Amino acid sequence: MSVVSLPQLLEAGVHFGHKASRWNPKMRPYIFTERNGIHIIDLVQTARYLNEAYEYVRDAADRGWRFLFVGTKRQAAGIIAQEARRCGSYYVNQRWLGGMLTNWATIKTRIDRLKEIEEMESSGLLDRLPKQEASRLRRELARLEKYLGGIKTMRKLPDAVIIVDQRREANAVQECIKLNIPIISLLDTNCDPDLSDIFIPSNDDAIRAIKLIVGKLADAIYEGRHGQLDTVEEDEYDYEGAMDLDDDILEDMEDEEEGEAEEG
């Protein structure tokens, strides 16, 4: 029994890595082959590592651990918010603010400010202020909500952090390492497994791949807190036929490469 089937992984495009020229050699053990210049991730290993991650997260949630989901890229942002909310976790899906964990005391004061203005809004106080002052406070509220809304109920550091795109979220990774907070991450073929405590070899650009893996980790948290979820049986599937890149996955991968080029 597995938390996900190989057909599900294939259909979501989890097996498509980056261009072979952009790989991290440390990911060699998790690569099945190269096709048309693209590394193909070994999905048998993906399924195994996902099962292990699921058990780890489920058991940790059962012990009362609190999780922070991090994914600020376009393809991941909506999924991160949706899945974190579904399982009652925290999330950062816009910009990672420097010191978000390592300078938690300062971040917490900004969260307190967010709640203060929210209370002013809900109580009707903003409507009684001069128009210019009310407008300024509402702009401040929108800005704070955008960057801190996903952690405004977080009163202390998380027990573990789930990350989509290790390279993009390098600052979050380094803060977790500095504070000895366990990192659970999707690792594409350009990532470094040494920077994660628990990892799942997976495409981290395609929306469907992110949705599947992050959704399963959210399931694990939910199960740990609330009870059993169903696992899946393996079915017969045309694995070779599913190895071809489809247009949606290619578009997501190309968008990510263009974004990295602009940042560089």
From Swiss-Prot:
Signal peptide bounds: none
One molecular function GO term is:
structural constituent of ribosome
GO BP of this protein: translation
Q: Name one GO cellular component term.
A: cytosolic small ribosomal subunit
By its UniProt entry, which Pfam families does this protein fall under? Ribosomal_S2
Q: Which UniProt keywords apply?
A: Ribonucleoprotein, Ribosomal protein
Q: Which InterPro entries match?
A: Ribosomal_uS2, Ribosomal_uS2_bac/mit/plastid, Ribosomal_uS2_CS, Ribosomal_uS2_flav_dom_sf
Q: Which family does it belong to?
A: Belongs to the universal ribosomal protein uS2 family.
| Protein name as annotated | Small ribosomal subunit protein uS2
Gene name linked to the record: rpsB
